[in-house]
């Protein structure tokens, strides 16, 4: 196991810079998730750590070694990809052992490592099967087993669950987390799925357009998002953003409604309200004209517009509820649930 240091990393293709001064310290045994939309640079960053992409500027250290110039095979890492990349003509046992054979590990040691990994991943009954005889989840376990047998210092996961259906994704992400906790190996995991990121990561690095928007625990990102991008990306449904004016410890919405708050912000702001932090209240200041209601079973999502404006809003309410189209419902934000952002920079306004 080892720590990883990303020191002011830059990646450019010709004159086009795609990663901009990425920095972060990943502690020994930590599970870090790099999350962001397609094209934000997350897989490029992972491939730089792996040695599959060159570093334009900056430095990557694994443990006490700077690895910029090291080949992937010399970095003591193991990768698990979206594509399982299993050899179809080999059994599960042979697929898991292949990398060790290339490294000329003894047969006894190979057998021991393969069987140990198979027990961890509950693959022992399938060791003599071919990949075509396995389900998608079992194939992904084989790919993880192939990484485990190498006893690396670092695991790198590049969207490993993207090819699985929704139910299997939930099952496999729990298995990956339990596996990492059991082995204690420093891990970096890339995904575009914020729910996957929140449930897996000790900390999340949110990328947007090649820049790090925020690097912190899931709860830090949820409770105190540093920017409107993070606020809108982390949490489901996404945060509501309302144009407003702050003064004297309160916030006034575009329709004149006033919300009591705290802090010293003054002037034009963007008010962020999470859909789950709005409580029904007949005299509440946030009045929403209903367009439709989504019944999800455990909760209901009310879609509409802030009364008197064209600002779209979503409210999440527990249990079952119904409301006629064009009805107006009033809500009050829960205590300490107001998020204020600078409308020009998108950055959080200090409270």
UniProtKB/Swiss-Prot annotation:
Subcellular location as annotated: Cell inner membrane
Keyword Cell membrane: yes
Transmembrane annotation, as ranges: none
Pfam families: ABC_tran, OB_MalK
GO CC annotation terms, alphabetical: ATP-binding cassette (ABC) transporter complex, substrate-binding subunit-containing
Binding site for ATP: 36-43
GO biological process, one term: carbohydrate transport
EC number: 7.6.2.10
Keywords for this protein: ATP-binding, Cell inner membrane, Cell membrane, Membrane, Nucleotide-binding, Sugar transport, Translocase, Transport
Topology of the protein relative to the lipid bilayer: Peripheral membrane protein
Listed GO MF terms: ABC-type glycerol-3-phosphate transporter activity; ATP binding; ATP hydrolysis activity
Alphabetized SUPFAM superfamilies for the sequence: MOP-like, P-loop containing nucleoside triphosphate hydrolases
Catalytic activities: sn-glycerol 3-phosphate(out) + ATP + H2O = sn-glycerol 3-phosphate(in) + ADP + phosphate + H(+)
All residue ranges annotated as the ABC transporter domain in the record: 4-234
Record-stated family: Belongs to the ABC transporter superfamily. sn-glycerol-3-phosphate importer (TC 3.A.1.1.3) family.
Biological function: Part of the ABC transporter complex UgpBAEC involved in sn-glycerol-3-phosphate (G3P) import. Responsible for energy coupling to the transport system.
Subunit details: The complex is composed of two ATP-binding proteins (UgpC), two transmembrane proteins (UgpA and UgpE) and a solute-binding protein (UgpB).
Protein name in the entry: sn-glycerol-3-phosphate import ATP-binding protein UgpC
Species per Swiss-Prot/TrEMBL record: Ruegeria pomeroyi (strain ATCC 700808 / DSM 15171 / DSS-3)
């Amino acid at each position: 196991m080892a720590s990883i240091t990303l020191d002011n990393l830059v990646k450019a293709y010709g004159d086009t810079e795609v990663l901009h001064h990425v920095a972060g310290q990943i502690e020994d045994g930590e599970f870090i998730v790099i999350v962001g939309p397609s094209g934000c640079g997350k897989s490029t960053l992972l491939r730089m750590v792996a040695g599959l992409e060159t570093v334009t500027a900056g430095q990557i250290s694994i443990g006490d070694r700077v690895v910029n110039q090291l080949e992937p095979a010399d970095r003591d890492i193991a990768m698990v990809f979206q594509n399982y990349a299993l050899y179809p003509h080999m059994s599960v046992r042979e697929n898991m052992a292949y990398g060790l054979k290339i490294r000329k590990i003894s047969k006894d040691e190979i057998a021991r490592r393969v069987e140990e990994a198979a027990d961890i991943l509950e693959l022992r009954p399938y060791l003599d099967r071919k990949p075509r005889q396995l389900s998608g989840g079992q194939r992904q376990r084989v790919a993880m087993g192939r990484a485990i047998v190498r006893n690396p210092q670092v695991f790198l996961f590049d969207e490993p669950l993207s090819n699985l259906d929704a139910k299997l994704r939930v099952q496999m992400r729990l298995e990956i987390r339990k596996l990492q906790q059991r082995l204690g190996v420093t891990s970096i995991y890339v995904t575009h799925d914020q729910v996957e990121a929140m449930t897996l990561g000790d900390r999340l690095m949110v990328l947007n357009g090649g820049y790090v928007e925020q690097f912190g625990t899931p709860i830090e990102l949820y409770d105190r998002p540093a920017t409107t991008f993070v606020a809108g990306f982390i949490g489901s449904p996404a945060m509501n953003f309302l144009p407003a004016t702050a003064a004297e410890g309160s916030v006034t919405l575009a329709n004149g409604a006033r919300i009591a708050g705290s802090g010293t912000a003054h002037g034009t702001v963007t008010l962020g309200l999470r859909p789950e932090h709005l409580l029904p209240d007949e005299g509440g200041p946030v009045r929403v004209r209903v367009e439709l209601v989504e019944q999800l079973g455990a909760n209901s999502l009310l879609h509409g517009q802030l009364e008197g404006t064209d600002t779209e809003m979503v409210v999440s309410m527990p249990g079952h509820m119904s409301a006629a189209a064009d009805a107006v419902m009033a809500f009050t934000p829960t205590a300490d649930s107001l998020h204020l952002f600078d409308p020009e920079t998108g950055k959080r306004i200090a409270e």
